[in-house]
Amino acid sequence: MNERMKVWLVEFSNGERIARVGKYEAWKSGAEYIRDTYNALIAEAAAENDREAVRSITVEGLKALTEFKTASVRRGNFECDPLVRVTELEVY
């Protein structure tokens, strides 16, 4: 019984790693991490009443999500450097 299965290893900048069955699930996990990371930075800037930083971080976050989504539509591995890396693996 040599069945192969594809899984996607999602590695986060905080050192956490998870495996997902399905590329969409891997992308979803990565996108959620990117959103959470940028939302924390936005909240920190908002607490300091730094509107320019809030705007700038929001724009950067949207760019990061867009780049991550664009990278995910290609075959194979994709990442949002340095926050998330997704590696396609075959498991036997």
Give the ranges of each region predicted by the language model.
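A short, exposed loop/beta-hairpin motif centered on an aromatic-Gly-Thr core
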Residues: S13-E32
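Short, mixed-charge low-complexity intrinsically disordered segments
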Residues: D36-Y92
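Short aromatic-glycine-(Arg/Gly/Cys) micro-motifs in beta-strand/loop hairpins
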Residues: N2-E16
